[in-house]
Swiss-Prot record:
InterPro entries reported for this sequence: DPNP (IPR006239), Inositol_monoP_metal-BS (IPR020583), Inositol_monoP_superfamily (IPR051090), Inositol_monophosphatase-like (IPR000760), Inositol_monophosphatase_CS (IPR020550)
Known cofactor(s): Mg(2+)
Physiological role: Phosphatase that converts adenosine 3'-phosphate 5'-phosphosulfate (PAPS) to adenosine 5'-phosphosulfate (APS) and 3'(2')-phosphoadenosine 5'-phosphate (PAP) to AMP. May regulate the flux of sulfur in the sulfur-activation pathway by converting PAPS to APS. Shows no activity on myo-inositol 1-phosphate, beta-glycerol phosphate, NADPH, NADP and 5'-AMP.
Binding site for adenosine 3',5'-bisphosphate: 145, 239, 263, 266, 280, 292
Gene it is expressed from: RHL
EC number assigned by the record: 3.1.3.7
Identification of the protein by name: 3'(2'),5'-bisphosphate nucleotidase
Enzyme kind, highest EC tier: hydrolase
Organism: Oryza sativa
The organism's taxonomic lineage, starting at the top: Eukaryota, Viridiplantae, Streptophyta, Embryophyta, Tracheophyta
Binding site for Mg(2+) 3: 78
Amino acid sequence: MSQAAGNPYAAELAAAKKAVTLAARLCQAVQKDILQSGVQSKADQSPVTVADYGSQILVSLVLKMEAPASSSFSMVAEEDSEELRKEGAEEILENITELVNETIVDDGTYSIYFSKEGILSAIDDGKSEGGPSGRHWVLDPIDGTKGFLRGDQYAIALALLDEGKVVLGVLACPNLSLGSIGNLNGGSSGDQVGALFSATIGCGAEVESLQGSPAQKISVCSIDNPVEASFFESYEGAHSLRDLTGSIAEKLGVQAPPVRIDSQAKYGALARGDGAIYLRFPHKGYREKIWDHAAGSIVVTEAGGLVTDASGNDLDFSKGRFLDLDTGIIATNKQLMPSLLKAVQDAIKEQNQAASPL
């Protein structure tokens, strides 16, 4: 049964899927140019910056055109227009404007042409602070910037908050195969590439091709023996305490090496059973942003999984732009969660004891 049947957020879901699909087209065009030109940094003039802004503008446009207007439009997103309004930013603003307009024309759905001022205004649609009341869209226009630059995994991640709760999430993963991932950077041999994950509260989770295909219901794996489990973590070592995640895996009895991929594509892969566990333990002092987890977490929970902080608390997306949580984020199926939580807490305790002076 499709999520549209009996889904109170069916119209919002359709708009969200359309929004991230259009944004993905823009991102794919830019990534192709990056790989051909050899760009490898997120400098202010770099193509990835253009793609970040362009993706956000297109998502905002489609949502405002397609999603039911319950009240004033509100979106919590990563980018604002401050840098683009500064002296010296004219060239990058010109590039963004040109790319967005080209994408809209190529798509053919909307007869809209953005001026530069219209571009700046559309970017600032994402300046909402979110919070516990009302409806707020939550967007990461390119999650996994370094993966995007390398030609690896990235995601356009969009969720809807309703009264502080995530009720809908979509993940466009242009480089993720539709088949189960088979190596350590999320690639797969021979499978069609470009996955679109979606979930609505109470209606389950699905995956379909970004190019358009019937949606298929997905569910997390049913593994209950940690020895048979594999775990996902960030590709970038700077994003993760690998000594800690390695200790957790060892205490749990996991024998497979970690599968390291960028972005919330990890949540999508976990939700369809490609692996059993996701561990995210950033370095001390890092504050998690809600757009880094809102869409991915509901895809996993609607696929039958659990997503919590290191103490087993549900993630609270109602506190504004940041998550207020304990230490890290873990996700797995219901069978493995009790033993995973114990391994996490034992490993953290051991690490803290080793770090404290005698």
